[in-house]
Swiss-Prot record:
Homodimer. Interacts with host TRIM25 (via coiled coil); this interaction specifically inhibits TRIM25 multimerization and TRIM25-mediated RIGI CARD ubiquitination. Interacts with human EIF2AK2/PKR, CPSF4, IVNS1ABP and PABPN1. Inhibits post-transcriptional processing of cellular pre-mRNA, by binding and inhibiting two cellular proteins that are required for the 3'-end processing of cellular pre-mRNAs: the 30 kDa cleavage and polyadenylation specificity factor/CPSF4 and the poly(A)-binding protein 2/PABPN1. In turn, unprocessed 3' end pre-mRNAs accumulate in the host nucleus and are no longer exported to the cytoplasm. Cellular protein synthesis is thereby shut off very early after virus infection. This is Non-structural protein 1. Residues 180-215 are annotated as: CPSF4-binding. Its main location: host cell. Keywords: Eukaryotic host gene expression shutoff by virus, Host cytoplasm, Host gene expression shutoff by virus, Host mRNA suppression by virus, Host nucleus, Host-virus interaction, Inhibition of host innate immune response by virus, Inhibition of host interferon signaling pathway by virus, Inhibition of host PKR by virus, Inhibition of host pre-mRNA processing by virus, Inhibition of host RIG-I by virus, Inhibition of host RLR pathway by virus, Interferon antiviral system evasion, RNA-binding, Ubl conjugation, Viral immunoevasion. A motif (Nuclear localization signal) lies at residues 34-38. It holds the Pfam family Flu_NS1. The keyword Amino-acid biosynthesis does not apply. InterPro entries: NS1, NS1A, NS1A_effect_dom-like_sf, uS15_NS1_RNA-bd_sf. It is found in: Host nucleus; Host cytoplasm. It comes from the Viruses.
Length: 230
């Protein structure tokens, strides 16, 4: 198991604990409480996948955060916050790629939380890359504008977009939707890669083959989700 995956989970558990304390003191608004509930479900799922106890992970996460805060000077903290709080908009796709109409021979649509996943299940044995335009804050994907799947020839064969009726989504929502899209495309023997920018800010890591760091268990689950919907 990758040590970065474990430490990220541990820190996320502790930060969720801190946010829970804020909520318990009636200091959180409705969106804050909604994210808290969503992230709780996400942490339970990640803990089950990683085989880690959430309570133990929270304690270790606290130690990691305390060590970082102890080592960081006030000036370094101010500089980090100044850069991190500035939201950035990153673009894998051109305006033409974002606005281009596309058609599906065998359309498939699935709602994944507050996101809509669409794909053409007629596509087989293709090399596909996922590109996205999104905003980033704290070096993590904040809001997805649009994600599209392209073949090497430039044809659009899949898409993930926010649902207008369900505004607001989390980084985990986006990763789950990407998992659904990848699972559906790989079911037809396509090879799917994720853009380096998307890997960096959605997963904070990258694989040499361009794929997101899904575990074998997660991949089987994604494929099963698509098969059950077909």
């Amino acid at each position: 198991m990758d040590s970065h995956t474990v430490s990220s989970f541990q820190v996320d558990c502790f930060l969720w604990h801190v946010r829970k304390q804020v909520a318990d003191q009636d200091l959180g608004d409705a969106p804050f409480l909604d994210r808290l509930r969503r992230d709780q479900k996400s942490l339970k799922g990640r803990g089950s996948t990683l085989g880690l106890n959430i309570e133990t992970a929270t304690c270790v996460g606290k130690q990691i955060v305390e060590r970082i805060l102890k080592e960081e000077s006030d000036e370094a903290f101010k500089m980090t916050m100044a850069s991190a709080l500035a939201s950035r908009y990153l673009t894998d796709m051109t305006i033409e790629e974002m606005s281009r109409d596309w058609f599906m021979l065998m359309p498939k649509q699935k709602v994944a939380g507050p996101l809509c996943v669409r794909m053409d299940q007629a596509i087989m044995d293709k090399n596909i890359i996922l590109k996205a335009n999104f905003s980033v804050i704290f070096d993590r994907l904040e809001t997805l504008t649009l994600l599209r799947a392209f073949t090497e020839e430039g044809a659009i064969v899949g898409e993930i977009s926010p649902l207008p009726s369900l505004p607001g989504h989390t980084n985990e929502d986006v990763k789950n939707a990407i998992g659904v899209l990848i699972g559906g495309l790989e079911w037809n023997d396509n090879t799917v890669r994720v853009s380096e920018t998307l890997q960096r800010f959605a997963w904070r890591s990258s694989n040499e083959n361009g794929g997101p760091p899904f575990t074998p268990t997660q991949k089987r689950k994604m494929a099963g989700t698509i098969r059950s919907e077909v």
